[in-house]
């Protein structure tokens, strides 16, 4: 009796895997392009960065790797068990449910704004339920044939496949459902479990199973040590889940759990060294040149080497000292690409290539597959090097007292190069897919085993130990115990510990509850992927505390369902955003971030507005309302930590207006305009509108004070994080840009003494209540205003700039329009206000009297 392979299901899942791979890679390429061309595909919510990023990661995990490994399992089960899968009819039902409901449905829902902000669990709960159902069906489909075998007959690939399916079925709900039931820090503990379990108990067992299977099938030799393979298998399921919390080191999670995760990460590296040694020695004992001759074997060998590299890298970056430096940077993104594209995808490609060579009636192009191998090796290698370099640069800049935008600017060349690498990877994926549909066609024939043949592997000559040959109950029970241990140690324990800590530490009267509008804003923040650029956790590190403020406490997160701590920072952390910037700034920044910061790579959100930043929809207002809840409870109870004072350079360098203009264009032109006239779209949308720097001569004291401390009541932030040389350069530039000029004699409505007295009368009538009798901005009404009225001792307006202000007012400030003033009165009050200026520049006499101060005496 012959045991056939379900070849139609193998083909179906293989083709589905290729479609998923190409689409997922296109999602990723679009995401990469948006880093250096943020306006690319930006006019529709479905194409925003966050949603495409969600579909990229979920597509790689489920559409590509999931289908690839399922196809391989269909091929491998008859060889490993000498039995067919449970039911081909069940297989087709599972195929359509998995691909058309879970994957395609998940992609569609994410793009339409239905998702969850959980790493590697972005598909919404309704799709998560379908995936969990599919995992259960996989256990029925593939697990039953394995369970009918004796433990002593099961090859190590079977152990990995069965263990991966079983423990993924158990772990998947922890990262997808529990964070919705446990808020903030408590939910983060379970999210951390799934972040690592997605790789550790799903991807890794499948990939290693492929490697063990292909090695013995190609070399026709036994593996080096069956004992080592079993030790590596059980250590994997013991240690890997314990790694989860290393994604949240220096957070408010219990330090004991963080230390366990750190230690487990190191032990995981040791386990991988054991597994990789066993795999490589198995190849080394084989016929010379097998790796070079067999292209799928080449993919497998590369996967094994990359498995070692990525695991050692993961162990190193989990060490707390190094983690405090490198976490949240592109180093981590390079690490994840090395894992998912390098280790996992190369293993999947090796497995698919191996089985496709043996499938009847299909085309196979060995040369195209070999070309794809080199395209992928080069593309992946360059990408990992590029992202690693970017991460080191970002981490170094974050440790310095520099504006956040400096790390974005420094990353731009790396991000451009990553897109080039991404094109190489996409080309490699396409060529790999073409190798399955071009070339000569394989002959028709039977694929499978017969009852009188052994599987295409050979048991190790090493004597089997007794505990390896006992019933499934012992070894499987040990695995369940290991899984429960990780669940208790890094899920339940932190949650209970945090619950008790939160009960004790929550201050009385803490403002934690969110309004319906704020909750809706949080939902918008989640579905658009904001948590994948901005973390919501200030870590307990000196660099975080200096830059963002007080570290995030667990009690502050009790209303976050689910938590959105994040694992990457492209933009700054927002955990202390409440009250930091005015609402008008937030709205302009949402509409188009480059209106505020020209070098920003944040996507714009025009669909949240009715054509301009001054016409926000309710969604935009709700999103801003949510941003202003972040850190609100702490801010209301604890005084904000003072920022480090700016230390002025001792020696004043030579004035460098070119350097100052460069700094101005990079940091200030978004609001103030390229000509410093306040006429940018973003600047005119702010309230108060951006200041017309070109229309005023400003004193050095005012410039330096404003750059150092910002302008309270306006969107003008502090720039005391600029390097001292840039700070002085832009200050010098601002001192030079305002050229108020003088009145030509033929432009004067009256002699200067008449202008002075007339202006004094207009000022006393209309301006003194706010600007004060001495025009110092300290009038009885002005002292209650933010921003404070102009202090004319520190600024000299030009006549055209003052005329515009008197005619139109300053929208968003206490300065009203005075449209009834005549041109002569406008000139007179401007002349009078200019007379108070005491900074550098032309001085104007203050007249003590005039022969006539009547306006009718002015021509």
Q: Model segments located where?
A:
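Extended surface/linker regions that mediate inter-domain or inter-protein docking
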Residues: 457-501, 603-657, 662, 674, ...
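Membrane-interfacial, low-structure loops and terminal tails that flank and connect transmembrane helices
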Residues: 1-2, 286-290, 445-468
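Sequence/structural segment immediately N-terminal to covalent heme-attachment motifs in c-type
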Residues: 513-536, 546-553, 654-675, 753-776, ...
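Non-cytosolic membrane-interface motifs at loop->transmembrane helix junctions
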Residues: 117-128, 153-157, 186-196, 254-265, ...
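Membrane-interface helix-loop junction between the first two transmembrane segments
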Residues: 30-45, 183
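Hydrophobic cores of alpha-helical transmembrane segments in multi-pass integral membrane proteins
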Residues: 11-36, 49-83, 88-112, 125-145, ...
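Extracytoplasmic electron-transfer domains, predominantly the class I c-type cytochrome c fold
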Residues: 511, 515-518, 543-627, 685-735, ...
């Amino acid at each position: 009796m012959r045991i056939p392979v379900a070849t139609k299901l193998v083909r179906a899942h293989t083709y589905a895997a290729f479609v998923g791979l190409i689409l997922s890679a296109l999602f990723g390429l679009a995401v990469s392009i948006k880093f250096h061309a943020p306006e690319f595909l930006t006019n529709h919510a479905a194409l925003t960065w966050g949603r495409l990023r969600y579909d990229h990661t979920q597509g790689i995990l489920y559409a590509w790797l999931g289908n690839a490994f399922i196809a391989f399992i269909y091929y491998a089960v008859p060889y490993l068990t000498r039995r067919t899968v449970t039911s081909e009819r069940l297989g087709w039902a599972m195929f359509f449910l998995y691909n058309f409901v879970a994957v395609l449905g998940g992609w569609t829902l994410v793009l339409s704004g239905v998702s969850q902000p959980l790493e590697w669990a972005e598909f919404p709960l309704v799709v998560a339920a379908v995936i969990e159902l599919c995992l259960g069906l996989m256990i029925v489909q593939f697990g039953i044939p394995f369970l009918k075998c004796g433990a002593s007959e099961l090859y190590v690939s079977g152990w990995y496949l069965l263990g991966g399916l079983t423990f993924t079925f158990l772990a998947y709900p922890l990262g997808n459902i529990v964070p919705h039931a446990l808020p903030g820090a408590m939910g983060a503990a379970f999210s951390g479990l799934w972040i690592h379990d997605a790789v550790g108990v799903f991807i890794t067992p499948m990939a290693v199973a492929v490697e063990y299977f292909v090695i013995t099938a190609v070399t026709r030799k036994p593996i080096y040590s069956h004992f080592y393979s079993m030790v590596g298998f059980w250590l994997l399921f013991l240690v890997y889940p314990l790694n989860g919390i290393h994604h949240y080191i220096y957070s408010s999670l219990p330090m004991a759990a963080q230390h366990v995760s750190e230690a487990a990460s190191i032990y995981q590296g040791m386990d991988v060294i054991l597994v990789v040694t066993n795999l490589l020695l198995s190849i080394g004992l084989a016929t010379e040149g097998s790796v070079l001759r067999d292209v799928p074997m080449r993919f497998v060998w590369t996967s094994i080497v990359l498995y070692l590299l990525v695991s050692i890298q993961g162990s190193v970056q989990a060490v707390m000292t190094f983690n405090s430096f490198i976490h949240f940077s592109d180093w981590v993104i390079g690490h994840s690409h090395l894992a998912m594209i390098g280790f996992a995808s190369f293993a999947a490609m090796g497995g698919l290539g191996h089985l496709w060579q043996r499938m009847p009636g299909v085309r196979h192009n060995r040369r195209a597959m070999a070309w794809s191998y080199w395209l992928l090796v080069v593309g992946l290698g360059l990408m990992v090097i590029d992202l690693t370099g970017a991460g080191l640069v970002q981490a170094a800049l974050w440790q310095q007292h520099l504006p956040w935008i400096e790390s974005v600017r420094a990353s731009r060349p790396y991000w451009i190069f990553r897109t080039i690498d991404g094109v190489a990877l996409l080309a490699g994926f396409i060529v790999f897919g073409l190798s399955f549909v071009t070339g000569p066609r394989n002959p028709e024939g039977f694929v499978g085993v017969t009852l009188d043949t052994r599987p295409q592997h050979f048991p190790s000559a090493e004597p089997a130990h007794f505990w390896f040959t006992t019933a499934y109950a012992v070894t499987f029970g040990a695995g369940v115990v290991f899984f429960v241990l990780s669940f208790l140690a890094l899920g339940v324990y932190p949650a209970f510990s945090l619950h008790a800590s939160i009960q004790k530490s929550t201050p009385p009267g803490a403002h934690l509850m969110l309004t319906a509008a704020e909750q809706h804003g949080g939902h918008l923040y989640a579905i658009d992927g904001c948590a994948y650029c901005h973390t919501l956790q200030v870590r307990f590190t000196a660099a975080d505390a200096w830059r963002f403020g007080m570290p995030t406490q667990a009690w502050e997160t009790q209303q976050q369902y689910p938590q959105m701590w994040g694992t990457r920072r492209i933009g700054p952390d927002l955990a202390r955003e409440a009250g930091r910037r005015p609402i008008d700034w937030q709205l302009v920044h949402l509409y188009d971030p480059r209106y505020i910061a020209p070098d920003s790579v944040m996507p714009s959100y025009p669909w949240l507005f009715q054509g301009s930043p001054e016409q926000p929809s309710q969604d935009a207002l709700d999103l801003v309302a949510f941003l202003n809840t972040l850190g609100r409870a702490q801010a209301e109870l604890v005084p904000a930590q003072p920022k480090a004072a700016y230390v002025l350079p001792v020696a004043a360098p030579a004035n460098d207006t070119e350097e100052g203009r460069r700094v101005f264009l990079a940091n200030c032109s978004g609001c103030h305009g390229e000509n410093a006239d306040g006429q940018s779209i973003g600047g005119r949308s702010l309230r108060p509108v951006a200041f017309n720097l070109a229309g005023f001569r400003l004193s050095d004291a005012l410039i330096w004070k404003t750059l150092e401390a910002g302008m309270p009541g306006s969107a003008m932030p502090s720039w005391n994080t600029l390097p001292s040389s840039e700070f002085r350069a832009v200050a010098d530039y601002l001192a030079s840009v305002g050229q108020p000029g003088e009145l030509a004699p033929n432009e004067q409505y009256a002699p200067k003494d008449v202008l002075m007295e007339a202006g004094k009368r207009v000022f006393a009538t209309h301006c003194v209540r706010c600007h004060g009798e001495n025009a110092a901005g300290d009038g009885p009404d002005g002292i209650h205003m933010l921003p404070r009225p102009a202090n004319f001792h520190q600024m000299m307006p030009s006549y055209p700039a003052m005329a515009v202000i008197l005619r139109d007012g300053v929208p968003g400030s206490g300065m009203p329009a005075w449209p009834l003033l005549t041109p002569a009165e406008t000139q007179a009050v401007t002349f009078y206000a200019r007379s108070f200026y005491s900074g550098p520049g032309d001085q104007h006499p203050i007249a003590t009297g005039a022969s006539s101060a009547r306006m009718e005496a002015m021509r």
